[in-house]
Amino acid sequence: MRTDDANATAAERVQDGANFESADRRVLFGQHFAAISGAGPLVGPILAAQMGYLPSVLWIILGVIFAGAVQDMLMLWISAKRRGRSFGQMATDEMGKVGVLIISVFLVVVTAIAMAFLALVAIKAMASSPWAVFSLGMTIPIALIMGCYERFLRPGRVIETTILGFVLLVLAIVGGGMIAANPVLAPIFTLNAKQLVVALVLYSFAAAALPHWLLVTPRDYLSTLMKIGTLASRSNGPTFSGNLFPFLFITIACGALSGFHGAVSSGLTPKAIEKENQIRMIGYGSMLVESFTAIIALIAAVTISQGVYFSMNMSPSQIEATAGSAYSASASPEQNAAAAVSRMDVQNIEGQRMRVEWQSDGTVYTGAEALDAAAHDVGEETLVSRTGGATTFAIGMANFLRSYLGGEESMAFWYHFAIMFEALFILTTVDNGTRVARYQIGDLLGNVRRLRKFADPTWRPGNLITTFVATALWGTMLYMGVSDANGGINAMVPIFGISNQLLSAGCFMLVTVCVVKAGLGQYAWIPVVPLVWDVAVTFTADFEKIFDPQLGYFATASSLRASIDSGQLEGEALATAYASLSNAYLDGVLSVFFLVMMAAFLAVGLKTIVATVRARAYGDHLTSQEPFLESNWFAPSGLIATRLERKVQREFEQRHARRAELG
């Protein structure tokens, strides 16, 4: 990468106090980690646990080393060398306007789907929970206090700011429990899903529009304090018979490789980085920590009872289909779930048939009683069909922590702590995703001659307009999703994983183009190897979801059409069938759209590489890389500064303070 700390970064070159503003490397590490590490490394591995923990662990470890962390670091590198330009801007500069039109449209749509999906997971966890609403709401003023404290009161005192934020965060969590137990205050903080959508949209607009240092950076750093340090243990897990390739790699997603990370690493984090040598620590290091989080999530899934796991992760329709003749409309959800599990042909590692069981207060409960006991222990009415992975992670984490901290009585506390833990990180990703979408919309509009000013990230009116458009896109899908179980974002959840991984292919292609054009072709294999693997996985998965007679969206639509035409459905069943039919066609069309768009982008990239090689025109001067500019700043390169770096840092700060006093 040939990083050089003597070269001024985008934060130093522009320094507009809003988008281009340097951040302490430790804070930026936390902010970047929180931005990329939303629900993905938690939910994906939990769902992939059904396919077996060994292949999941192998892909998380190998995938992050050779693909995920490589992508994040190299995208951060090429953007930092280009004044913090976004994915779309770099595609324009290196591959032409065709490239930017393709990737900007692709990225805006995928980001909107991702933000709506992640927000839906958070809202499901927060709805009707005054504890979660109060605690999460308090992170906003806490972040504002941290931002102002570090910028105005005690500049550069990161440890002091960290302690302040951590203490206030713990008080917010404890206060949330007190609020939930108060009969007067609890109703005030008890919000339904629609109310939470409105609150979340308003917050995200403000977070994306305000200066980065004021709210997003300290809040993301605050989120990191909650995520790092989770304990781990060993256990046996559930098994699942099915095709690991390609869907295991799609399901785990962010735990090993994610295209969304490339968007955050380009145009967002590079605008705040102090020195080029911090790129490896922030880009590669943050992704390594995220993969560790994915391992913890996988452990959380496999430490709970298999029967409880499947009862939580089967939808009502799946329970009915699996239970067969044992299903009863008059029975409780717990009874039907237990009946469905008893009919599943799944065995544990000892070869025993799976059953629903739960241990509480020294008693081992089985069947429906086990599900009732588990729900009672965490303070929920039911745990059946709590799909999405969030509840599974919270149960697993609480079940583990109660063994070491607090015993049986602490189960509910740790469960709600885990729910807030997840929701806080999800909302952090939504904050940054909105900002990423804003940049991409600006890039897209900037290609129109009369709207070129929108491509300037320092233009305030353009920032507000593009932020509104970005928020409206995912906010509308989210509101429709909470209003209709079959509409809005619910209809597009199935395509999220594949589209996100397709975006990774675009990231690797752009990096390859930049590497070749810079005359570093001998190192092109570094992005090319994961590019080839990612294309093989995602294109195979997309083809199967489009054309497979059993898994394909259009095959599902044909089956639903046949059921509707048979005349045997009526009432709610008929309405559900029509909604599912529309969703199947929508997912099929979008899958084709994403596949064609990414294939076209890869073709444009390949054409650019071939043209460069044939012309034998190489060098940084032929790329959009910024020319060298002597830096007047100093900052340590690693997370922990050396003794010499601390000495130079003190001298630099003293000199800077004297200059400020002299005006």
Spans of features found by a protein language model:
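Membrane-interface "cap" regions at the ends of multi-pass membrane proteins
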Residues: M1-L42, T224
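A generic transmembrane alpha-helix motif of multi-pass inner-membrane proteins
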Residues: F166-S223, G242, I250, M477-E645
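Low-complexity, proline/glycine-enriched hydrophobic segments characteristic of transmembrane helices
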Residues: N182, Q306-Y404, K545-Y578
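Selective recognition of specific alpha-helical transmembrane segments in multi-pass small-molecule
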Residues: L107, A112-A114, V167, L171-A172, ...
